[in-house]
């Protein structure tokens, strides 16, 4: 499968190049960097530390998508929206690991999915997606009247969005288990005299510092006991492996908007 990596200059982009090189059935077709980036013109393999691959980094996404089978995208919401439109035009696979997307962005992805095979997730790792299933089960089993749900996450100091896409994914899983709408029940800020905790709400706490790749915990707090479900990411390659796995999975699927739960066979039967 001929894959394009966009945002190749970043840490995730370079991790993707390395994983593609070691994955049977995948090959790096093109690599896209930001216009004006110092990486433009450099060999993507050299950039990722795997040696020359004969794939120079370009800032022309349209040309890069020609004759490709799929694109893997951990960039920014505004660029992911642009890439989804290009993927739809090219009728190819688009794997989106970008977080911090707005409802308007999500609507654009849904529109693009009429022609592209899009897999979008706040986290591409197997462990986190399994965790989300367990969170939904726990939230369903432990009733809101006696159990409060809090989502705690920590990331490196350079992360620009909060709560993380993974924290929101886990919050959505908890809300699904409870049969509620997360947008109505989420509490993302607590400051000053907040009063008692709102019954049935799902709280979020965000920590930033150092080089932490990703730590997530979902706490279900009852009277006299706490159940904690957690995941720790020790290496960015777990996200890259999941993204490449998703691309290979989506290659023979119909156009549509899929999640990593679909890729991993963890989605609920429809």
UniProtKB/Swiss-Prot annotation:
Keywords: Amino-acid biosynthesis, Cytoplasm, Diaminopimelate biosynthesis, Lysine biosynthesis, NAD, NADP, Oxidoreductase. It is found in: Cytoplasm. NAD(+) binds at residues 7-12, 97-99, 121-124. Coiled coil: none annotated. CDD domains: DHDPR_N (cd02274). GO terms for biological process: diaminopimelate biosynthetic process; lysine biosynthetic process via diaminopimelate. One of its GO terms (molecular function) is 4-hydroxy-tetrahydrodipicolinate reductase. (S)-2,3,4,5-tetrahydrodipicolinate binds at residues 156, 165-166. It catalyses: (S)-2,3,4,5-tetrahydrodipicolinate + NAD(+) + H2O = (2S,4S)-4-hydroxy-2,3,4,5-tetrahydrodipicolinate + NADH + H(+); (S)-2,3,4,5-tetrahydrodipicolinate + NADP(+) + H2O = (2S,4S)-4-hydroxy-2,3,4,5-tetrahydrodipicolinate + NADPH + H(+). Catalyzes the conversion of 4-hydroxy-tetrahydrodipicolinate (HTPA) to tetrahydrodipicolinate. This is 4-hydroxy-tetrahydrodipicolinate reductase. It comes from Allorhizobium ampelinum (strain ATCC BAA-846 / DSM 112012 / S4).
């Amino acid at each position: 499968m001929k894959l394009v990596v966009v945002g190749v200059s970043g840490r995730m982009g370079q991790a993707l190049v390395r994983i593609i090189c070691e994955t049977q059935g995948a090959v790096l077709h093109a690599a896209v960097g930001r216009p004006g980036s110092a990486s433009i013109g450099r060999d993507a393999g050299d950039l990722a530390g795997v040696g020359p691959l004969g794939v120079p980094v370009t800032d022309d996404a349209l040309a890069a998508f020609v004759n490709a089978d799929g694109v893997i995208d951990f960039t920014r919401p505004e660029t992911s929206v642009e890439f989804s439109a290009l993927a739809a035009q090219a009728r190819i696979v688009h794997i989106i690991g970008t977080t911090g997307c707005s409802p308007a962005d999500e609507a654009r992805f849904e529109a693009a999915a009429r022609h592209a095979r899009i897999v979008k997730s706040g986290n591409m790792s197997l462990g986190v997606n399994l965790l989300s299933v367990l969170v939904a089960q726990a939230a369903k089993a432990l009733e809101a009247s006696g159990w409060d749900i809090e989502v705690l996450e920590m990331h490196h100091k350079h992360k620009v969005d909060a709560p993380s896409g993974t924290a929101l994914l886990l919050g959505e899983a908890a809300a699904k288990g409870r049969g509620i709408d997360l947008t109505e029940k989420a509490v993302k800020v607590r400051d000053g005299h907040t009063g008692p905790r709102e019954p049935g709400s799902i709280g979020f706490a965000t920590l930033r510092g150092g080089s932490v790749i990703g730590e997530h915990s979902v706490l279900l707090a009852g009277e006299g006991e706490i159940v904690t479900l957690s995941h720790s990411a020790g290496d960015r390659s777990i996200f890259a492996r999941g993204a490449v796995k998703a691309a290979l999975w989506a290659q023979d699927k119909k156009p549509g908007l899929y999640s990593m739960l679909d890729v991993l066979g963890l989605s609920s039967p429809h």
